[in-house]
Amino acid sequence: MSTIETLRRVLHECRTIAVVGLSPQWHRPSHFVGKYLLAHGYRMVPVNPMATEIIGEPCYPDLRTAATALKTQGITIDMVDCFRKSEDMPPLADDAIAIGAKCLWMQLGVVNEEAAAKARAAGLGVVMDRCVKIEHARLFGGLNWAGVNTRVISAKRPQQLPY
């Protein structure tokens, strides 16, 4: 599941995204992704057993707890975005299936064929070794040196951003 049309459809349809392994530390890649998702209209659900709140959102210790808490509000998790090691993925695939997610997304460097096969067999879309932030920016406009779309085309890095 990595054709441009499929990625675009997944990113358009999946509006509530649980970010498993989201870090409360501002300089971590997962934190950047969480902020990006919020800034682009997604409902981002932090999942990290070591935190109670990240980026102003309540944080849950595991995926099933998050899904149960959100279900009381009438919200379902559409995508599970995983910032975990490849070997940690099979139990997360089981959790994604159990909560009724539509897509299991494994971040850059994360590939696990066993987890992918489980998820696909249950009807989930699977994306491996790709970053949600990068793919969204690439497919919907928004990539440049600073990670945002300045609408300026140049091969030279600007001294200052024009906004």
Where are these regions (language model features)?
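A short helix->loop->beta-strand "cap" motif at the edges of active sites that frequently abuts
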Residues: 40-42, 99-104, 122-124
